């Protein structure tokens, strides 16, 4: 998480170094949970600092940093763009988590269209109808979803947007609750 450089600054740089050594092309992160003792303006200074340091390491190793919508600032398209625009680096891109984007109350498809040119990874997470009814617009994300295609998201549309709008091949990492759901 980028808001806490004293805790996670070295961790993200280590993750990038390891990724570069073992051939992993993308690492993902978010801003993390807000500290109680900082203001929003201070948080963005901390995020910028951490992201600049991480981008410097990532550029030298050919690793991309995927910014994920998962917390208080990145839960909207405007907030994620604000973080993305803090540091100009070819190493920084977007990891759109479709489930988190949906649960935040945003239009997943419009958001995906907007970030497609910057997309470096996609967390393929579907959300069940009951999960949607209980949490949409109330949370910034969830660690697990349901099997892709069994929830509220239109996967044919998502795949079509990625194929048509992304300038690179994109890995879809499936995030669901069980191995059986992942196999579907």
Label every model-predicted segment.
Residues 1-94, 156:
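Active-site acidic/histidine proton-transfer and metal-coordination neighborhood
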Residues 24, 119, 167-169:
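A structural motif
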Residues 32, 127, 177:
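Flexible loop residues that form catalytic
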Residues 37, 132, 182:
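Glycine/Thr-rich phosphate-binding loops of Rossmann-like dinucleotide-binding domains
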Residues 49-152:
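Acidic/histidine-rich catalytic cores of soluble enzymes
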Residues 147, 156-158, 163-165, 170-174:
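H/E-rich (His + Asp/Glu) clusters that bind or coordinate divalent metals
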Residues 173-183:
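A short, acidic, flexible beta-alpha connecting loop/helix-capping segment that sits on the rim
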């Amino acid at each position: 998480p980028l808001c806490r450089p004293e805790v996670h600054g070295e961790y993200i740089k280590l993750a990038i170094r390891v990724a570069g050594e073992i051939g992993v092309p993308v690492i993902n992160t978010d801003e993390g949970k807000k500290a109680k003792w900082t203001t929003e303006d201070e948080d963005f200074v901390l995020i910028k600092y951490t992201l600049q340091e991480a981008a410097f390491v990532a550029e030298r190793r050919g690793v991309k940093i995927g910014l994920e919508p998962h917390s208080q600032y990145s839960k909207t398209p405007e907030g994620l763009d604000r973080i993305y625009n803090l540091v100009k680096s070819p190493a920084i891109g977007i990891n759109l988590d479709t489930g988190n984007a949906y649960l935040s109350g945003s239009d997943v498809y419009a958001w995906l269209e907007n970030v497609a040119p910057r997309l470096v990874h996609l967390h393929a997470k579907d959300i069940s109808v009951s999960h949607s009814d209980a949490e949409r617009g109330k949370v910034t994300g969830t660690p697990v979803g349901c099997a892709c295609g069994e929830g509220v998201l239109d996967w044919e549309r998502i795949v079509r947007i990625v194929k048509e709008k992304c300038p690179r091949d994109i890995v879809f990492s499936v995030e669901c609750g069980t191995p059986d759901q992942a196999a579907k």
